[in-house]
Structure formats: C-alpha cells, structure tokens
C-alpha cells in the first residue's frame, strides 16, 4: 500500500498595505496601544515585525567550545490585521485606502486624516 504524502500548501503572496519603515499602532493583544516602526514585512505569512512590540526571549546555546550560552530578546512577528497605520502628526491610528492619481500612480492615504503616505 502506498504511503500518503502530505499536500503542499500553496504559498500565495498577499498584497499588504503596510510597508517597511511605516509607523503602526497595535490594536489587539498584550501590546495593545503600543506604536513602533515596521522593521520587516512577511507577505507570504501576512505578518509584520514591529520595533519594540511582541518581544520574545530566546535562550541560545553556545556554538563553540569556551563560549557561554546567552539570552537574546528579539521582536516576534505580529499578524498584519492586528496593526493599523499611525499618523505621527495627528497622533491617531487609521485604516488605509489606495488612491489612484491622475498620472496613474497609486498612493496610500489614511482614511481618518486624509494624510498621504507615499
């Protein structure tokens, strides 16, 4: 009898409205209300890594003889639906809409304040 192989999950890239360098505010979870800069986006997983948010402690074993192990704190990823773009001028978080300019270029705009991001 043949052995069943697990099905491969299709990796579908999700178009994200949050980009590296944006300032975002966490809207749910233990870090609710915290703001930080997006360090990295993970579009396949629909997640972002935000500076100073969702800190995890990791114990690292020594790699060479004579080296001691250490404890490292680093930011873990947060789902993109749990953050909103944050306006530093108005100090408010808002959803994002895509606006097509007359020349055909796309810009991101905050819905609450009307502030253009790109």
UniProtKB/Swiss-Prot annotation:
SUPFAM superfamilies: Translation proteins SH3-like domain. One of its GO terms (molecular function) is rRNA binding. PROSITE patterns: RIBOSOMAL_L24. It holds the Pfam family KOW. It comes from the Bacteria. Gene3D superfamilies: 2.30.30.30. GO terms for biological process: translation. GO terms for cellular component: ribonucleoprotein complex; ribosome. SMART domains: KOW. Keywords: Ribonucleoprotein, Ribosomal protein, RNA-binding, rRNA-binding. One of two assembly initiator proteins, it binds directly to the 5'-end of the 23S rRNA, where it nucleates assembly of the 50S subunit. Belongs to the universal ribosomal protein uL24 family. Part of the 50S ribosomal subunit. This is Large ribosomal subunit protein uL24. The gene is rplX.
């Amino acid at each position: 009898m043949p052995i069943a192989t697990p099905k491969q999950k299709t990796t579908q890239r999700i178009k994200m409205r949050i980009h590296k360098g944006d300032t975002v505010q966490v809207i749910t979870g233990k870090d609710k209300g915290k703001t930080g800069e997006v360090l990295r986006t993970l579009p396949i997983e629909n997640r972002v890594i935000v500076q100073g948010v969702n800190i995890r402690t990791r114990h690292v074993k020594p790699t060479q003889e004579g080296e001691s192990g250490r404890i490292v704190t680093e930011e873990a990823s947060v789902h993109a639906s749990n953050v909103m773009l944050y306006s530093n001028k108005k100090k408010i978080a808002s959803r994002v809409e895509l606006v097509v300019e007359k020349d055909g270029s796309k810009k991101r705009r905050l819905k609450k304040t009307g502030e253009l991001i790109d």
